[in-house]
Amino acid sequence: MPRKKTTDEQSQIALFQAPEVPNAFRKPVQVIHSKPKTSLSLLHRKLANAWLKNASDTPSDDGWWTIHTATMATDIGFDSNNRAYLIDSARALMGIIFEWDVIAPEGKRKLWKASVLFPEVEIRPDTIRYQISRPLREQVLTPEMYAMIDLNVLKPFRRASSLALYEH
């Protein structure tokens, strides 16, 4: 049986039309509906999502998770070599205090809680190591209620507000 002839153009187009494999994870609603005391930039939100996904996909090393900088950059669409900007964003993310259970009316809350989600971060030339707050670790890693967040969908976002709307 003769082979169907294809042109180079058809072959090239076919290469780029394959659907992208989802890069999803379960983000706890407690994190989505938390209220940071300061605003989160787009990079803060993308970093937090990449770190939470990595933590849910890989086992910890005595409470520390490691992610390769190149993998993280690909996951969040960070195409800059500006290491100082990455360090500043990680530092700022460490200082953001989240209030938990902000959906319930103030008078009806069973528990008010505030904490830092990522209390410690180490940035090395090729890896980033981070911790998730010990009291929140169980809720973050095995959430009962969650939203499926796909990092591939987050990549093209250029505004923190659009990413926040997608998550909600």
Regions found by a protein language model. Give the residues of each.
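Charged, alpha-helix-forming regions
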Residues: 1-168
